[in-house]
Regions:
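Acidic/histidine-rich catalytic neighborhood of metal-dependent amide-processing enzymes
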Residues: 1-59, 94-96, 100
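Active-site-adjacent substrate-binding region
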Residues: 52-101
Length: 101
């Protein structure tokens, strides 16, 4: 895949999704991928029925949902499979609160 890759570290994405706006003006990307944290649910204080089954050490999480580009998501899953990389699928029924929304 031939492409230009830009990596940007941002802040304030939880407050109005403002963190990456200034960077995107300069870069004008075709696709954005947010690398962010999520919560492991393999502890007694989190309900897996509500939050899903995400295990610490279980591999990166690839989310599906209405704000995730299905083509990009499918491509990430395909690449993980080709590389025999363990990943954890998860779902989000709403915007995620990251700069990629």
């Amino acid at each position: 895949l031939e492409c230009a890759l830009y990596s940007v570290s941002t802040v304030q994405e939880e407050i109005g999704l403002r963190g990456a706006i200034t960077s995107t003006y300069a870069v004008d990307p075709h696709v954005g991928v947010a690398v962010d944290v999520t919560h492991a649910t393999d502890c007694p204080t989190i309900d897996k029925k509500t939050e899903g089954d995400v295990r610490l050490g279980g591999g990166p999480v690839i989310y599906r949902g209405p704000n995730m580009n299905p083509v990009v998501t499918s491509r990430l899953v395909s690449i993980a499979g080709r590389l025999e990389m363990t990943y954890q699928p998860a779902a989000s029924g709403r915007p995620t609160g990251t700069d990629a929304n």
